[in-house]
């Protein structure tokens, strides 16, 4: 049985989005919890990403991945990690600009977002170092190169 159930929502009509099987593998690899969980991964366009980024982060531009951890009411235990909102056009554009394989960049965004759902952050330097080291290790286990080598922009969620 899988540790992570992925609810994949497609709100993007374009091409280049990886398969649900890949999203499941990446989310599973990044899940550090002992118990099974569920995550919603919503693939969106620039408009929806910009709107959510503006509403929740005060930034009026689309972004690669937004993470929304599930916060259960007191006394209620539900196996939900939360939601990831990934902007397909931004991920594809970043991959081109950074000369990265698009699938590798998609995997990085899922791993990055899943770690955010588990409380990891990159605001403080020491937290960023811990999170990035874990991302590098998890992506290597999935067969991908270090995403931070020669990177021009960082994940912005």
From Swiss-Prot:
Keyword terms: Cytoplasm, Endonuclease, Hydrolase, Metal-binding, Nuclease, Ribosome biogenesis, rRNA processing, Zinc
Family stated for the protein in its record: Belongs to the endoribonuclease YbeY family.
Residues noted as binding Zn(2+) in the record, renumbered to the chain: 112, 116, 122
One Pfam assignment: YbeY
PROSITE patterns linked: UPF0054
Cofactor names: Zn(2+)
Organism: Marinobacter nauticus (strain ATCC 700491 / DSM 11845 / VT8)
Gene name of the record: ybeY
HAMAP family the UniProt entry points to: Endoribonucl_YbeY
UniProt-annotated location(s): Cytoplasm
Gene Ontology MF terms in the entry: metalloendopeptidase activity; RNA endonuclease activity; zinc ion binding
Name under which the protein is recorded: Endoribonuclease YbeY
Major location category of this protein: cytoplasm
Covalent S-S links between cysteines: none
GO cellular component, one term: cytoplasm
EC number: 3.1.-.-
Known function: Single strand-specific metallo-endoribonuclease involved in late-stage 70S ribosome quality control and in maturation of the 3' terminus of the 16S rRNA.
Keyword Translocase: no
One example of a Gene Ontology biological process annotation: rRNA processing
Database matches in InterPro entries: MetalPrtase_cat_dom_sf_prd, YbeY, YbeY_CS
Binding note for cofactor: Binds 1 zinc ion.
């Amino acid at each position: 049985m899988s540790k992570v159930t992925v609810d994949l929502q497609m709100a993007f009509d374009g091409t280049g989005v990886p398969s649900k099987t890949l999203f499941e593998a990446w989310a599973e690899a990044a899940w550090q919890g002992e118990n099974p969980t569920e995550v919603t991964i919503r693939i969106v366009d620039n408009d929806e990403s910009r709107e959510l980024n503006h509403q929740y982060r005060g930034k009026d531009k689309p972004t690669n991945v937004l993470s929304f951890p599930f916060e259960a009411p007191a006394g209620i235990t539900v196996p939900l990690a939360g939601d990831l909102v990934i902007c397909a056009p931004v991920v594809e554009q970043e991959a081109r600009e950074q000369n990265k394989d698009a699938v590798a960049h998609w995997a990085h965004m899922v791993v990055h977002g899943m770690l955010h759902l588990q409380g990891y952050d990159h605001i403080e330097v020491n937290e960023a170092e811990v999170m990035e080291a874990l991302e590098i290790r998890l992506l290597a286990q999935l067969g991908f190169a270090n995403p931070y080598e020669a990177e021009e922009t960082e994940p912005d969620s």
